[in-house]
UniProtKB/Swiss-Prot annotation:
Quaternary structure (record): Part of the 30S ribosomal subunit. Forms a tight complex with proteins S10 and S14.
InterPro entries assigned to the protein according to its UniProt record, in alphabetical order: KH_dom, KH_dom-like_a/b, KH_dom_type_2, KH_sf_prok-type, Ribosomal_S3_C_sf, Ribosomal_uS3_bac-typ, Ribosomal_uS3_C, Ribosomal_uS3_CS
Pfam families: KH_2, Ribosomal_S3_C
Keywords, ordered alphabetically: Ribonucleoprotein, Ribosomal protein, RNA-binding, rRNA-binding
Job description of the protein: Binds the lower part of the 30S subunit head. Binds mRNA in the 70S ribosome, positioning it for translation.
Name used for this protein in its record: Small ribosomal subunit protein uS3
GO MF terms held by the record: mRNA binding; rRNA binding; structural constituent of ribosome
GO CC entries: cytosolic small ribosomal subunit
Family: Belongs to the universal ribosomal protein uS3 family.
Domain annotation KH type-2: ranges: 39-107
Length: 224
């Protein structure tokens, strides 16, 4: 059987950027990496209902900058910014340096693989039929302008005795094309029969200019 490489990992430095940006010597590298994992875990748990897709961490000179990409910025910020201030205080305590939090709104949540995977998982937990959940997610993404979408679920589907995996795809998802902008994410649905895994691939088109084009587009978004 053909083994599949992680679609994001193989594209790092080509059309994908790292989610952690900092430099550390040998002595503190492991500590900082572990700290990043703990911070991400804490934010995901604290903002479980805020549709958080991605968390970027930067560490410029004795400070830290955390960017939270979410479809519901109002929930993250809270009344008069109370919730985001609480979060900043807690992260400062965890990281041991002053933390600045940026919140980026996701304009099209249907085109975000992480949010799409979370959506399928939530539907499965509400006992929606898995085929209907997959089809709905794929069609929503295609309607928003995706060039191709694939959703796969695996586990005791429909309460079956034997676990299996099923998938549904529309459009094309070229995993071997390195310049293809493929958003990939996974999620888990906790059902009465056990855990059901969800994988989502969303193909948004090809990036001809490489990582430079990605960075230029991000700067344009930031200046708006």
């Amino acid at each position: 059987m053909g083994q599949k490489v992680h679609p994001t990992g193989i594209r790092l430095g080509i059309v994908k950027k790292h989610t952690s940006t900092w430099y550390a010597g040998k002595a503190e590298y492991a500590d900082k990496l572990n700290q990043d994992l703990q911070v991400r875990k804490y934010i995901q748990n604290a903002l479980a209902h805020a549709s958080v897709s991605r968390i970027d961490i930067e560490r410029p000179a004795n400070t830290a900058r955390v960017t939270i990409h979410t479809a519901r910025p109002g929930i993250v910020i809270g009344k008069k910014g109370e919730d985001v201030e609480k979060l900043r205080t807690e992260l400062t305590k965890q990281m041991g340096v002053p933390v600045h939090i940026n919140i980026e709104e996701i304009r099209k949540p249907d085109l975000d693989a992480a949010l799409a995977a979370q959506s399928v998982a939530q539907q499965l937990e509400r006992r929606v039929m898995f085929r209907r959940a997959m089809k709905r997610t794929v069609q929503n993404a295609m309607r928003q302008g995706a060039e191709g979408v694939k959703v796969q679920v695996g586990g005791r589907l429909g309460g079956a005795e034997i676990a299996r995996s099923e998938w549904y795809r529309e459009g094309r998802v070229p995993l071997h094309t390195l310049r293809a902008d493929i958003d990939y994410a996974t999620a888990e649905a906790s059902t009465t029969y056990g855990i059901i895994g969800v994988k989502v691939w969303i193909f948004k088109g090809e990036i001809i200019g490489g990582i430079e084009e990605v960075e230029a587009n991000q700067k344009k978004k930031g200046s708006k």
